[in-house]
């Protein structure tokens, strides 16, 4: 029986050595036949050492005792996944006693509980300068195969964005599969969607069995989020795409000839970290070139961050990993996915808007945003708070808070917060309201989100909302009219979205995060036929394309652009691609003014490196950046050494023992060869000078003499040595040092920002500088 269990769990041939962690799993899996265990169970991510021999497995197996196999208190551990590519280890549901046994077994490194991560929930390609048949989108630059793996809610394979017309056969290097499942056949894949897998064991261990009346236990997308991100990154060109006539035009992914591999690890209530790791692990094994992750959790140390650890494994295999920054802005230090080997993407505006004019009874006009395209509403009475419902939640229009006798036929005012935006509209409609005015709070500022509401609705910024509420407070019979203007172009853009999470990074403050901004507000892309555009079950509408917002939408823009760069520069490392995207980013808008920040105090405030990183992505310039900052696995490991990580914690990333260099004690985390600079100064401390070293690689003109230009952060003197970098050949590497001298301490915590640029002919290699006083 011993041998049967061993072969059933871990089959192997005589000429294939077993990994040590597999022997470790067999050992703890079977050793519990000999002991009683406590009944409380929880799912864990477990990291183990990566050494292996079949002899160890056999010797452990032969040492087992099973005399208590029939004990009534016996509880079998549940092993969900074995991780071999993204990390070394496995996930399992264990009792407390079983976890203790695992911790005391040779080869164990660490364990932490599974958790649910959150999703960070088209014309944008044209706004970024990508047009069919021109420049980067001509046939020459699109000739090679690049595979984008998206970890999300799945995909809708029949969607028009995923046609494989004129695509070449699937690359022979592809090792993935198209897994069967509920309402998903292997025949659903084609030359565009070349891989499909679903991961739900971790989710079900936390939440319970998936409700297959509302979701599919397969890669099929029941929510729409995964279809939206996949079509944004790599969707085919679709003419006349629109949302009920709005935003009509050409829809396309950033790299429309790329292949797609869909890994469904996100379900109705979120994404279990164990499932996300399993999806990344499979993507690495399958052979993707880019991994796109529009999801994340709260910021935490990298050694307990599943995306940071699994993303490191992908980076080691030369895979570019793009992650959303999160939707917790504009509060500072909310950015997630901040590991330096990940590309962290903030959300920005395009110049496309959906204006609606609200004219209130005192003849003032307020400008909002709406996807409704019906007839105007004229002189309807307004209802708000106590004039709309008797419950305290009426101010937010939460479920069952409004009274029909108070709101029927009226325009209802709802404040943002406490419930979903489209759910507020559902409550207004349920209560007989004619329309909704959704007012931003001070925290949300002037953000104008165009949501797919179930009734006529207008989003208003904080200032106009305040004007509206002041009018309402002083009017006996307040009324309003609304005129819907459809789709408009030419608004000031780009601009950082207020909801986009901000730096500095809590886990790694010496690395400026986020890295880059990309379109993430009111983005049109493909949608699932099994989900309403509002995500409300009461909404019977079905659409081919939907308009939604979030850093979730920004992330696949960068994933697709990274694939585009990879198709032109197949030998570039993930760090080189990241550097090219960052150092060529735009910092001015379409009015030639500094890119603004919707979440900052003051309507004209310029965005900083903690809002948009290096700037807004410019794909055309990114393909020819001149210089790049390359970073190796060893560089990243030395960075972890500089964080004073123990050898055990570094082992989580390296997979094998890594000895920190003797000079690591004098290295700063800021010495990582990164395309931006984060300088941290402590008020009142003796440390007034910080010095960083950088090395750049010439990927532009073989001979070029770069001159440095510095715009100093307020309160800091910046010195660069040398001031000139003379390159004589392609791929030559030259180094420089930057010294930051604080002029004086600050009285409180604050930040100031500057820029360092290397200039030669057409090249402007720009790196942002962020200085923080603590």
UniProtKB/Swiss-Prot annotation:
Residues 379-472 form the PA domain. PROSITE patterns: SUBTILASE, SUBTILASE_ASP, SUBTILASE_SER. One of its GO terms (cellular component) is extracellular matrix. The active site is at residues 152, 225, 552. Changing residue 552 to A: Loss of protease activity. Its main location: secreted. Transmembrane segments: none annotated. Coiled coil: none annotated. The keyword Lipid biosynthesis does not apply. Optimum pH is 6.0. Its EC number is 3.4.21.-. Residues 122-623 form the Peptidase S8 domain. This is Subtilisin-like protease SBT1.1. It comes from Arabidopsis thaliana (Mouse-ear cress).
